[in-house]
Swiss-Prot record:
Its EC number is 3.2.2.27. It is an enzyme of class 3 (hydrolase). Keywords: Cytoplasm, DNA damage, DNA repair, Hydrolase. It is found in: Cytoplasm. Its main location: cytoplasm. InterPro entries: UDG_fam1, Ura-DNA_Glyclase_AS, Uracil-DNA_glycosylase-like, Uracil-DNA_glycosylase-like_sf. NCBIfam families: PRK05254.1-1 (NF003588), PRK05254.1-2 (NF003589), PRK05254.1-4 (NF003591), PRK05254.1-5 (NF003592), ung (TIGR00628). This is Uracil-DNA glycosylase. GO terms for biological process: base-excision repair, AP site formation via deaminated base removal. Disulfide bonds: none annotated.
């Protein structure tokens, strides 16, 4: 059974859902959702692909696996639901946005407005057990999300790929098309942000590139709720 995105990802990814690795992943997930507390909700797993059609992708921000606390994850890398405290890595992203582009620091971490502007907020693993980071690593999601990156790499319109931290930077090998722009640094996590994330200006660099190819720049300001 294929997931439905209701956009051009449906045709592009339909073959993945028939592959053995995905059928095994699906069996694993059915059991996990029955027996464990899993994030995000099964209805939110593919939100990044549902909100940002292939043809509209301007920017990819690659994350690792979803937040594993209650009510945080909702299918977008780095984003949390409204009313949930902004996690530390996202707080640091907002600090960098403030120094880079002067955006005020919002009272929430709900990044849906980025997704609607063509930012694919993609985690490399799309599900996780509550309280257990990386618990769904190596179960098949990486094959699926690598395929997403490969399809984006083939696109004839340039895309900005933002890769923060070792896990994301390891995907650089999939981005071989020279028309794309890669922006990379250490992760915005408090463990590494002072070692090269702060001051790296990824947001203005992204907009400068988009303007250079006659694309509308991103409005990075997340509004207060």
């Amino acid at each position: 059974m294929a997931a439905e995105f209701n956009n051009d990802w449906d045709d592009l990814l339909k073959d993945e859902f028939e592959k053995e690795y995905y059928l095994n992943l699906r069996k694993f997930l059915i059991d996990e959702y029955k027996t464990q507390k899993i994030h995000p909700s099964m209805y939110d797993i593919f939100n990044a692909l549902k909100f940002t059609p292939y043809k509209d992708v301007k920017v990819v921000i690659l994350g690792q696996d979803p937040y594993h606390g209650p009510n945080q994850a909702h299918g977008f890398s780095f984003s949390v639901k409204p009313g949930v405290q902004t996690p530390p890595s996202l707080r640091n992203m907002f600090k960098e946005l403030n120094s880079d582009l002067g955006c005020y620091i919002p009272n929430n971490g709900f990044l849906e407005s980025w997704a609607k502007q063509g930012i694919l907020l993609l985690n490399t693993v799309l599900t996780v057990r509550e309280g257990q980071a990386n618990s769904h690593k190596g179960k098949g999601w990486e094959i699926f999300t690598d395929r997403v990156i490969e399809l984006l790499n083939k696109r004839e319109e340039p895309i900005v790929f933002i890769l923060w931290g070792r896990n994301a930077i390891s995907k650089e090998t999939l981005i071989t098309n020279p028309i794309h722009k890669i922006i990379k640094s250490v992760h915005p996590s408090p463990l590494s942000a002072t070692r090269g994330f702060f001051g790296s200006k990824p947001f203005s660099k992204t907009n400068d590139f988009l303007v250079s190819i006659n694309k509308e720049p991103i409005d990075w300001q997340i509004p207060n709720i």
